[in-house]
Amino acid sequence: MTLTGRATASADGRDSTEPRIAAGEVHVWVADPDALDRDGTLGGYRATLSQPERDRAAAFRSEADRLAFEAAHGLARAALTWCAPAVTADAWRFTTTPHGRPEIVGQPPLRPLRFNISHTAGLVACVVTLGAACGVDAERVHRRADPLRLARRVCSPAEYARLVPLDDPDARADLFFRYWTLKEAYVKARGYGMTLPMNECDFEIAASLPAGTPTTVEGRSVARFGPRLRDDPARWRFAQWRPGPRHLLALAVRREPGLPCAVVVHPAPPPLP
């Protein structure tokens, strides 16, 4: 996976109706829902939501959960319009697969836009590609929680064996969430949700993870899949980073033969035209 750093906010000189995304590119946006609300961006995003999305948002009892839902879905619409400026943010229409993965309605079959969103307390994320299956997972690391009970179910035996000897609860929680976000991003990219056995994904990752910059996790040496997944880890590229001190973000993208896999992390949420 090639990391191209952060996208520039300057105009690229192309016709505003031309797609800004090319095959082999992976565009990622992250944002704080509260910050979007404070600066007024969320109000614009909220106006682009469909009536079913507004109804779902209104059903949340928690104000924080409602803001995160609106921010994630508004961010997705703005990001898709950034990639394809000929379509306004409120014009995108979506359907869901039998396992709940959102897909765009009415696209050409050859290299359609693919996207995925994630939201957690204090962070929303969106990834967009041209044709490549993709998944993103954002999590706030709960350092006080002991993850071993859940780890028995979702971690591979090798991953679980690495967690158990860690005496520091913060270190154990951090490593567990690193495994969890990579697995979540992968199963979301596959489009089968929790029906895929997470413990069949085995990641061998470095103990430290720097903040801010995506770190690649790729190849058979660090990702191994069990037979029930019916998949080849060599076909996938993973990245993981800390967008802030309390959050982890993981990305999974299916590699297309003959194409690069260039991750572009945008410095700010996309504005609405």
Give the positions of each predicted feature:
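Core catalytic alpha/beta fold that binds nucleotide/phospho-ligands
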Residues: 1-273
